[in-house]
A protein has these predicted regions:
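Divalent metal-dependent catalytic cores for phosphoryl transfer on phosphate-bearing substrates
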Residues: 53-157
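Acidic/His-rich, divalent-metal-binding segments that scaffold phosphate/diphosphate chemistry
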Residues: 1-75
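Residue-level signal for secondary-structure boundary elements
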Residues: 21-24, 129, 160
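Short, intrinsically disordered, charge-balanced linker/junction segments flanking boundaries
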Residues: 37-38, 157-161
């Protein structure tokens, strides 16, 4: 991913996304996919340079997966408009494909590890945030694994989120 940096991805995100909650969501997904990239790199026995490059690619993908959503929120636009912007800015095809695959309605099947991880982390980050929002403090600090597992058993919880 030469040419793209986390800083340039953050700049692109903040150019298109003003909502602090969407920015927090992007950072949460970024952190989640980065952790999975680190684990995957270890499992694959990658050297430190290859592992760092993999982690960077996953991080940028997680950070940018919804960057266009605030301006282009409809299924006809998101993530299609974002994909075109990323292509114009030189982001690699695998990053763009992962971002396309995170939205079921695009019809892009999730095939690679990064595509599957992005989808899972996007869903999980949203669920954890919803769990925090029903706490009296509305704080992530009050959310633990037990409360998340409890909410996962409740089929009606966060259905409309």
């Amino acid at each position: 991913m030469s040419g793209q940096s986390r800083e340039s991805a953050w700049s692109l995100l903040t150019e298109y996304t003003q909502s602090e909650s969407l920015r927090k969501h992007a950072r949460a997904v970024e952190a989640c996919v980065r952790a999975y990239a680190r684990k995957f790199a270890q499992e694959q026995g990658l050297d430190s340079d290859a592992a760092a490059e993999l982690e960077k690619k996953y991080s940028i993908t997680g950070l940018l997966h919804d960057f266009d959503y605030e301006r282009f929120p409809t299924p006809e636009e998101h993530p299609y408009v974002g994909n075109k912007i990323l292509e114009e800015r030189g982001y690699p095809e695998d990053v763009r494909r992962a971002i396309m695959s995170h939205a079921d309605y695009t019809g892009v099947q999730r095939q690679t590890h990064m595509e599957k991880v992005l989808f899972a982390c996007d869903e999980l980050a949203g669920f954890i945030t919803a769990t925090a929002l029903v706490k009296p403090s509305k704080s992530l600090a009050e959310v633990d694994a037990k409360s998340i597992r409890k909410k996962m058993k409740d089929k009606a919880f966060a259905r409309s989120v």
